[in-house]
């Protein structure tokens, strides 16, 4: 015989709370790794989470030049000297963006999040991060970007708990870790309403 259906867990509502402790991601970078050619995160002993690829432009880039990434797996944010240029989504087939004019020596950051893996069929070898290369394309000319500094951000509590959190009331425009505390009279099932936030993880 089947056992009795257990009683439903209690449901609670958490009052609204605010975040006041913030650690900007780019100010809390882990140990850097160096590579001439770009490689997926598995080559850096990372299986999930987020990875940051950083290089400097060896020459000035003209407005209208295309940045081509082969390939983004799975969701990327692209920054030039800390300014967000665009976001690319593999699910939508987004692997290119048109750049503004950028000076020689501009710091180019590509922050890539892995969003799960294909686990069957011909795509089972689903590497994460950037799988092959990054190119600057102008007309019929292309130049592959080299000499990358790489930072791995695994998704686990031990990695994020010791960041340099600072008190602030101003939310940064850059990716960041957010931390707060709240008190409960009792515990139970609940949902967090993140509808006013952007993309991230709790």
Ranges and model annotations:
Residues 63-79, 182-202:
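Aromatic-lined ligand-binding clefts that engage carbohydrates, nucleic acids, or primary amines
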Residues 50-54, 77, 87, 109-111, ...:
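Ordered hydrophobic segments in well-structured contexts
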């Amino acid at each position: 015989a089947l056992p009795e259906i257990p009683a439903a867990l209690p449901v609670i509502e958490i009052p609204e709370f605010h975040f006041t402790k913030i650690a900007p991601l780019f100010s809390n970078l882990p140990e850097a790794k160096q590579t001439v050619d770009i490689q997926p995160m598995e080559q850096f002993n990372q299986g999930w989470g987020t990875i940051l690829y950083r290089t400097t432009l060896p020459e000035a880039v003209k407005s209208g030049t295309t940045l081509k990434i082969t390939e983004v797996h799975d969701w990327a944010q692209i920054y030039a000297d800390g300014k967000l240029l665009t976001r690319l989504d593999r699910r939508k087939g987004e692997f290119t963006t048109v750049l503004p004019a950028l000076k020689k020596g501009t710091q180019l950051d590509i922050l890539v999040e892995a969003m799960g893996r294909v686990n069957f069929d011909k795509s089972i070898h689903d590497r994460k991060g950037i799988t092959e290369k990054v190119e600057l394309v102008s007309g019929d000319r292309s130049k592959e970007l080299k000499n990358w500094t790489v930072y791995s951000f695994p998704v686990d509590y031990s990695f994020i708990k010791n960041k340099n959190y600072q008190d602030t009331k101003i939310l940064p425009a850059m990716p960041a870790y957010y931390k707060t505390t709240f008190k409960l009279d009792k515990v139970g099932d609940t949902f967090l309403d993140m509808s006013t936030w952007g993309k991230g993880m709790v």
